[in-house]
C-alpha cells in the first residue's frame, strides 16, 4: 500500500529541515553502515496517531544555481504535483515576506490541503505576531517552535486530519514490481518491450498526476503481475524531471509499493552514484532485487565482458550479493523472456517460510562448523531461532547476551541459512534477542 505524501515547502532559513527532522524523528537515521546504503534527507517516513505518511522536504530538491524565486516556485509546484497534504513553513521572527506571499498565491490555486506552520515562535510573547499570516489567505496559522518541539503536535494533528482515507490492502496474490533507474537508462523501452507496444497504451489508471501508473498483465501460467511506474518517470516535461533528487523521490514512491524492484543500469554509461543510492533504498526497504543491465546490444563484447561486468557490479553493490544480474536489450528483446520467471522466483523467496525445526538444525550445524564467539571469557550461547515474518524473511535468534552476537557471526549464520534454503533475490534479516 502506497503511503500518503506530505510535502514541506517554504523559503530558505524558515526551519523546514528542522521541522522535517522533528516530524521524522529517529526514522531518518541510516540503517546500515555500508557504502551505497544511504538515507537521503529529503525523504522520510512520519507517523502520528497510528497513521504513517511519506514526508518530503522539497527544499532538498532545489537547484542551488537557480534564481531564488525560481527555487521556491519549483518547490511549490513539486508539492502540488506530489503531495496529499502541504505544510507551508514561514518564519514568525521575520513576519510575512514577499517570498511568502509569492508562494501562497501559487498554493492558493491547489485543491491539496495546505497547513500554514509559523515556525520560530520560540516564546509565548511571539504568538500574538502570528495573526499577520492570516493575510496569506491559507487559513489558521499554527505557531511552532521546531527547535523546542512546541506546536509540532498540533501540526501533526492537522496533517493526519487531512490525509486521504486509508486504502484497502492490496491482493497478495498479485506480484508487484517496479523498474527504477536514472533517466535515459531505457526504463520506458523496457516496459514497452515487456508488455508489447499495444498494451502499454492502456496502462494509466485514472487519478491525479502524482498517482503511480499501474500496468496489469498475466503470464502464460496465469500469474498476475502489476508493474508500477511513477507518473514522473513516464511523462516528459514535468518540472525537475531530470534532476537526480526529484528522480530519487519518484523512485522511492515506486519502491514503496513494490515487492520486487528491477534496478536498471545503462550498459553504455556504467554504474553511477545515483544507481547505488536508489539500490540502497530498495535494499533497506527489504525488497526483492534484480540488477538489469540494459542496452547490452550497444557495447563491444569479448569472452570476458560478462565476467568483468559482474565483478564490477558486485564490487559497487556490495550490499546486493543476493541480487541476480541479467543483461538485456529492450531493442532486440534479448533475455527479456526470462524476467517474468525470475520475478516470480524472487517473489516466492520473499514469501518463503522455514519450519522452526528445520531452521534450528541448520543453526546447530553452523555452530558445529564455526563455534560461537567469546568476549572476555564469556561465550555466546544460541538457544534457538525462529522465523517471525516474510517480505523480507526475518529470523530472530535467541541468545544469552545480545552484545556477544558480533555482526560477522550474524552474517555467517545468514550465509549458512542462504546455503541451506533458496532465498533468491531477497535480503534476509537476522536479529539477535536475549532469551527471557
Curated annotation (Swiss-Prot):
GTPase that plays an essential role in the late steps of ribosome biogenesis. Residues 4-167, 175-351 form the EngA-type G domain. InterPro entries: G_ENGA, GTP-bd, GTPase_Der, KH_dom-like, KH_dom-like_a/b, P-loop_NTPase, Small_GTP-bd. Keywords: GTP-binding, Nucleotide-binding, Repeat, Ribosome biogenesis. Residues 352-436 form the KH-like domain. GTP 1 binds at residues 10-17, 57-61, 119-122. It comes from Streptococcus pyogenes serotype M5 (strain Manfredo). GO terms for biological process: ribosome biogenesis. It comes from the Bacteria. Associates with the 50S ribosomal subunit. PROSITE patterns: G_ENGA. CDD domains: EngA1 (cd01894), EngA2 (cd01895). GTP 2 binds at residues 181-188, 229-233, 294-297. Gene3D superfamilies: 3.30.300.20, P-loop containing nucleotide triphosphate hydrolases (3.40.50.300). This is GTPase Der. Belongs to the TRAFAC class TrmE-Era-EngA-EngB-Septin-like GTPase superfamily. EngA (Der) GTPase family. GO terms for molecular function: GTP binding; ribosome binding.
